[in-house]
Amino acid sequence: MSDEDDLEDFETDQDDLEREDDEKETEEWEDYRKEGEESEDWISTPLTEDMMKEGLSLLCKTGNGLAHAYVKLEIKDRDLTDIHLLRSYIHLRYVDVSENHLTDLSPLNHLTNLLWLKADGNQLRSARLNELPYLQIASFAYNQITDTEGISHPRLASLDLKGNRIHMVTGLDPQKLISLHTLELRGNQLNSTLGINLPKLKNLFLAQNMLKKVEGLENLSNLTTLHLRDNQIETLSGFSKEMKSLQYLNLRGNMVADLGELAKLRDLPRLRALVLLDNPCTDENDYRQEALVQIAHLERLDKEFYEEEERAEADEIRQRMKEEQEQEAEVEPESELDQSST
């Protein structure tokens, strides 16, 4: 079995990433935070050889094909504070050290064959590691991470940093993160979308932050999914026609009050699904119709697809508006002539 085949078993489920039950994740996040606050002083618990024997599995050939080694390690929820022992297990490809009390992952710098890493629910303040040439999936969810510096793995495809304490995205270099297609940052303390200049990105999750507007995402030409649920967004500026691949946009639970803001989404040529539930604008009687009038190619609003009758009615309204605008344009020159003659 190839490394790629093995990795498929560990990849993040896209359906899970795109589901809309953020409430459950918020509860998990608060549980982790509470646990961390109540247990400031941990008893020192280093990783031991006995623990390694219990956690190792998946026997595979090593790089030269002449020997075998266990390449998967799962040591979850063991109250670990030190994983220094991992330095010598250089053949590991899949490592899960979640739900421990780790503050330092530097021993992983020696695992240059690492493909998959999960370190959720620890006491990490940084996700910084040396460049790992084969690392493809990394999850540091529900820690105490405050920045995004020191992440430069060239084959990294999916990065999960949800439920941390990040205020601003910095240090994510598109010249180094050339494979990153999924970035999970929901449940942080972000007050800006600046710093996410990653043209290869396809899925971006920014729900449950402190965002008031969208900015700096104009060059994400490959982005197909954008989650902005439960922020403080009032205006829909910041979207551009360069975002030509965006198909799904979730703005649920924001502060968009003016239906006219939807006109700013017209330039998104592939936008098919829009979620606006729990925004003030959804209280308007013609909310559903107005959305389709403004965005003609929209197929689904919230959880319901548009019917043919709705689409035909929206077409009629757009045509009527166009004719009225043309008539107004014809009247204006005549008014100017009348004024000049007097």
Swiss-Prot record:
Q: Name the segments for region: Disordered.
A: 1-42, 307-342
Q: Does the keyword Cytoplasm apply?
A: yes
Domain LRRCT, by residue range, is: 279-317
Q: Which keywords does the record carry?
A: Cell projection, Cilium, Coiled coil, Cytoplasm, Cytoskeleton, Flagellum, Leucine-rich repeat, Repeat
- Quaternary assembly: Component of the axonemal radial spoke complex. Interacts with RSPH3. Interacts with RSPH9.
Q: Which PANTHER family match?
A: LEUCINE RICH REPEAT CONTAINING 23, LEUCINE-RICH REPEAT AND IQ DOMAIN-CONTAINING PROTEIN 1-RELATED
What is the protein name stated in its UniProt record? Answer: Leucine-rich repeat-containing protein 23
Species whose genome carries this gene:
Bos taurus
